[in-house]
């Protein structure tokens, strides 16, 4: 772009030609700046955009530097989760979303209770009282924040996370038991682990026969499989009231069984029972938030990480 200058003869002065598409003292058009910013909505790197535009990486970073996202208002439902960002001196960062409208609200520099408290203290009491649902995983600081700052909200433990506790317990028993078998049997058990994890009533007749053969080889695994299957039946409950007694009974049975993995699982379920039962009252989950985390991982992997948290935050919010 040629910077044409005009000369005013009467006062012997020179001045730049005025262009609507070129800000004063700039050599880059507004359209090019807007194009660069729009390209960065995808999980691409500054380097790839700079190469495409034939610009330096620092120029692309400087152009994106004008993008700055402020804080949004709190919705009626909040979803919160952590992800491994390794930026700004912290290993984990925190993402806050609206799981109903599918909107990313903010990214916090850490998942600590101190960081979360500092953030939510910025909102008025009336705004916090309007939050009706608070969805999270089994990270204790999240529950503490919900209790302290969102007294009118219903705390919900995401279904995926508490169901996973039982699957982890069963998988641990399977791995422990298969170590006792011969090499041939170990290989067979390892290849068939998805059959053991899948609900028994969803298997074909042939698959059921395979599972029964494996369970016959290990009484401990057979007991663990029974507890796992009994637990999965609770998922068929339609509401909190119908799930309350079966869940309490299962926790009691698992707590008093002779399998350490399920005893530990029962203790975890007992500690989070209110949030687990509340998950039967609504279809709201952390599914959207987990999906955002996957996209953030792609951005981080492509860029080989971010050292500057503010820049990382703006890139994430810009993508959504």
What do the PLM-derived regions correspond to, one by one?
Residues 2, 28-32, 226:
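Alpha-helix N-cap/N′ positions at the starts of helices
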Residues 64, 89, 101-102, 109, ...:
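Acidic/histidine-rich catalytic cores and adjacent linkers
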Residues 59-145:
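RNase H-like nuclease fold core
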Residues 11, 80, 97, 160, ...:
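Single, functionally critical "micro-switch" positions that shape active/binding sites
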Residues 1-11:
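Single conserved hydrophobic/aromatic residue that forms the stacking wall/gate
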Residues 25-36, 106, 255-257, 263-264:
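Acidic, glycine-enriched active-site microenvironments
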Residues 94-95, 167-178:
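Short, surface-exposed amphipathic charged segments that create phosphate/polyanion-binding patches used
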């Amino acid at each position: 772009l040629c910077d044409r200058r005009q000369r005013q003869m009467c006062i012997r002065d020179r001045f730049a030609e005025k262009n609507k598409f070129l800000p004063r003292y700039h050599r880059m058009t507004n359209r090019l700046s807007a194009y660069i910013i729009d390209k960065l909505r995808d999980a691409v790197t500054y380097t790839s955009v700079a190469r495409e535009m034939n610009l330096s990486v620092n120029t692309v970073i400087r152009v994106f530097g004008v993008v700055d996202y402020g804080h949004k208002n709190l919705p009626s439902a909040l979803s919160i989760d952590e992800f491994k960002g390794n930026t700004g001196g912290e290993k984990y960062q925190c993402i806050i979303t609206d799981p109903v409208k599918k909107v990313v609200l903010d990214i916090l520099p850490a998942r600590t209770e101190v960081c979360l408290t500092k953030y939510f203290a910025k909102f008025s009491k009336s705004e916090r009282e309007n939050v009706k649902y608070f969805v999270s995983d089994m990270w204790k600081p999240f529950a503490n924040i919900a209790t302290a700052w969102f007294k009118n909200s219903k705390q919900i433990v995401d279904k995926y996370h508490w169901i996973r506790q039982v699957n982890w317990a069963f998988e641990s028993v399977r791995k422990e038991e298969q170590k006792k078998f011969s090499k041939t049997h170990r290989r067979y058990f390892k290849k068939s682990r998805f059959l053991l994890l899948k609900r028994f009533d969803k298997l074909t007749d042939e698959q059921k026969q395979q599972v029964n053969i494996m369970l016959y080889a290990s009484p401990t695994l057979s007991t663990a499989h029974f507890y796992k299957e009994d637990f999965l039946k609770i998922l068929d409950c339609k509401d909190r009231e119908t799930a309350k007694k079966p869940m309490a009974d299962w926790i009691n049975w698992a707590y008093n069984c002779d399998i350490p993995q399920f005893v530990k699982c029962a203790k975890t379920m007992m500690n989070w029972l209110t949030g687990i039962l509340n998950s039967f009252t609504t279809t709201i989950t952390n599914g959207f938030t987990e999906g955002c985390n996957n996209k953030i991982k792609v951005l981080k992997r492509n860029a080989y990480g971010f050292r500057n948290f503010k820049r990382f935050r703006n890139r994430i919010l810009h993508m959504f």
